[in-house]
Amino acid sequence: MQIFVKTLTGKTITLEVEPSDTIENVKAKIQDKEGIPPDQQRLIFAGKQLEDGRTLSDYNIQKESTLHLVLRLRGGMQIFVKTLTGKTITLEVEPSDTIENVKAKIQDKEGIPPDQQRLIFAGKQLEDGRTLSDYNIQKESTLHLVLRLRGGMQIFVKTLTGKTITLEVEPSDTIENVKAKIQDKEGIPPDQQRLIFAGKQLEDGRTLSDYNIQKESTLHLVLRLRGGMQIFVKTLTGKTITLEVEPSDTIENVKAKIQDKEGIPPDQQRLIFAGKQLEDGRTLSDYNIQKESTLHLVLRLRGGY
């Protein structure tokens, strides 16, 4: 059968092949036609880098399929992968390698199946289809390898419309990862998602285990209104603080924002609006607090009542 190989210069090469040809054979044919040594060739099909030992039929490459040929930079670069046991593995990679390729290299060295590997860089879990250069991973960068527990666990996410979404997660998944999974399923951008568990809004950088979220726990998904609103908080010293909030923010969330701005621990804050002391578990909309409302902040004396 015939297949096509497209180079980065836009040139298309036609090859005569068999479904049982290995990728290695195909690279040899490209060398015959174009003079490019196989060790400088990387072949991509359907977004995947093809491995030398596999056959065309393994990748479901059929007649008149088009492969993409990327030239491997001589020498590539080294990166390090640190495991939880403290062992450091050195890998030879290219900036254009996908995370999937990196996991395959780790499997070659360490025997760990890719589906049990989670790679972390700069606090972010790396996605299989992305490349090292997408994440700005450069020579001698260190990735962290976390083993994925077989099977993980299921959690539920309930929306305000009453719909319940089931997600496959790991205890070590970050809230950011969970929001990405919700985006995959429901198409809701992470920056419009707020996740609540046990009355608390969950922070992107924390993990499910940080919040003691276990299998079959239910999270609540609240959509963040674009833009939110501003409110003011006036202290006894007369100072006024401006906060960006959502009507669905809890009083607890507001106290956390005040702590971020002013350094006052939430347990020392009492918030008053319309003569009422506000309770942690309630939301701003529960108290009809609207944009540009002013709350009063009274400090709770330590040990007081």
UniProtKB/Swiss-Prot annotation:
Which residues are processed away as propeptide to yield the mature protein? 305
Q: Which UniProt keywords apply?
A: ADP-ribosylation, Cytoplasm, Isopeptide bond, Membrane, Mitochondrion, Mitochondrion outer membrane, Nucleus, Phosphoprotein, Repeat, Ubl conjugation
Q: Where is this site: Interacts with activating enzyme?
A: 54, 72
Q: Which Gene3D superfamilies match?
A: Phosphatidylinositol 3-kinase Catalytic Subunit, Chain A, domain 1 (3.10.20.90)
Recorded source organism is Rattus norvegicus (Rat)
Output the lineage of the source organism. Eukaryota, Metazoa, Chordata, Craniata, Vertebrata
Q: Which family does it belong to?
A: Belongs to the ubiquitin family.
Q: Which GO terms describe its molecular function?
A: protein tag activity; ubiquitin protein ligase binding
Domain named Ubiquitin-like: residues: 1-76, 77-152, 153-228, 229-304
Subunit description: Interacts with SKP1-KMD2A and SKP1-KMD2B complexes.
Instruction: Look up what happens after changing residue 8 to N.
Output: Rate of phosphorylation by an insect Pink1 is very slightly increased
Annotated phenotype, changing residue 63 to Q: Rate of phosphorylation by an insect Pink1 is very slightly increased
Might you name a Gene Ontology BP term for this protein?
modification-dependent protein catabolic process
> What residues bear ADP-ribosylglycine in this entry?
76
Annotated site location: Essential for function = 68
Q: Please state what the protein is called.
A: Polyubiquitin-B
Give the position(s) of the covalent cross-link described as Glycyl lysine isopeptide (Gly-Lys) (interchain with K-? in acceptor proteins): 76
